[in-house]
């Protein structure tokens, strides 16, 4: 578990109030701490499996299929080998090592502007107590 100082809520607040480049330039050390905290918190696969289980019970077949398809045999790769984070507006982007897959966390029930590069995307809308909706496109 990460220090609450570097919680998702804090990152969402930062992401919603700052420009990406300005934030990175002015907060490089803090950026690294946040990134490492997230990686530390999710380096075990619990969240990966929880999300997979959620997808199987989701009532929307299209979303269920999309999530399970993306996560099949790749849960740890997607969630446990995240290498860096990018902020843009109110959205928080996690990129996987080769940057072909990324995960978007948002505190708002909406999607970021498209297009964004990457062949797979998972939108994860985050509430205070955790995940409540994810969609892959």
Describe each PLM feature range.
Residues 1-77:
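N-terminal export/targeting and maturation segments
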Residues 42-137:
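Extracytosolic and intramembrane catalytic regions of membrane-associated proteins
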């Amino acid at each position: 578990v990460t220090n609450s100082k570097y919680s998702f809520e804090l990152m969402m607040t930062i992401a919603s109030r700052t420009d990406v480049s300005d934030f990175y330039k002015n907060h490089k050390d803090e950026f690294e701490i946040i990134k490492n905290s997230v990686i530390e918190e999710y380096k075990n696969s619990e969240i990966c499996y929880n999300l997979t289980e959620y997808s199987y019970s989701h009532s929307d077949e299209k979303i269920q299929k999309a999530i399970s398809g993306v996560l099949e045999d790749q849960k740890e790769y997607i969630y446990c080998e995240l290498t860096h984070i990018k902020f843009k507006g109110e959205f928080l982007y996690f990129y996987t090592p080769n940057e072909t897959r990324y995960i978007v966390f948002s505190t708002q029930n909406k999607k970021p502007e498209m297009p964004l590069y990457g062949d797979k995307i998972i939108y994860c809308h985050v509430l205070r107590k955790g995940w409540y909706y994810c969609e892959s496109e």
